[in-house]
Regions:
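A short Gly-Trp-Pro
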Residues: 1-10, 17-171
Length: 171
C-alpha cells in the first residue's frame, strides 16, 4: 500500500471502455458494511472514495447512470460501464451530481486509498476484522468529527452547490 499516493490517480472498468482520473486526494474514504452495499457489490463491504465530481475527469467513454435504491430510501445513481457493467462510482441523492463515491477497487492502484473509516459496522460480516487504528462506527457519522480540516474546507466550498441542487429537486 502506498503511504502517500501521487495524484492524479487513474482507474476504470474491467473492459477498459470507461476510464477516469481523480485529480486530487479524496475528501475521505469509507469502508461501508451496510447490507445494501454488500448486496450491490456482491462483497462484504464497499470501499468508496468521496470526491467532488469536478475532480473526476473522464478519459474515455461516459458511464451509464443507473437509478438504484439505497439504504436512505432516497436512492443513488450508479455509474456503470455500458459494456461490462462494472460500477465505477455512485452519486447519492443527498449531494446529487456534485459528490462522487468512487469505487476504490476500480483504481489502477486500488491499494493507494485505504479506508479512513468503517461505517455501518453493526451489519458487517462477523469474520471481517477491522484494524484497531481505523475509526469504526455502527451506522453513519458526523463528518465534522472525523474529516481532516482540508476536507472540511473543501466541503464548505462546494456546499452551496449541494444546497442549490437540493432546492432545484424540491421545486
Amino acid at each position: 500500500m502506498s503511504a502517500s499516493p501521487v495524484y492524479p490517480l487513474e482507474g476504470g472498468c474491467a473492459c477498459g471502455y470507461v476510464r477516469y482520473r481523480i485529480t486530487s486526494p479524496p475528501l475521505f474514504v469509507h469502508c461501508c458494511h451496510c447490507r445494501w452495499c454488500q448486496r450491490e457489490s456482491g462483497a462484504s463491504f464497499a470501499l468508496n472514495a468521496l470526491i467532488e465530481a469536478d475532480r473526476v475527469v473522464h478519459l474515455a467513454a461516459e458511464p451509464q447512470l443507473i437509478d438504484t435504491p439505497s439504504n436512505s430510501g432516497k436512492g443513488q445513481k450508479i455509474a456503470r460501464c455500458p459494456k461490462c457493467q462494472v460500477a465505477v462510482w455512485s452519486n447519492y441523492a443527498g449531494a446529487g451530481p456534485i459528490l462522487r463515491f468512487v469505487r476504490v477497487g476500480t483504481l489502477d492502484h486500488s491499494d493507494s486509498l485505504p479506508p479512513d473509516i468503517h461505517i455501518y459496522t453493526a451489519s458487517k460480516q462477523p469474520w471481517v476484522v477491522i484494524a484497531p487504528d481505523v475509526p469504526a462506527v455502527p451506522e453513519y457519522y458526523q463528518s465534522d468529527r472525523f474529516w481532516p480540516p482540508e476536507s472540511l474546507a473543501r466541503r464548505k466550498a462546494f456546499w452551496p452547490s449541494v444546497e442549490a441542487y437540493r432546492a432545484a429537486q424540491r421545486s
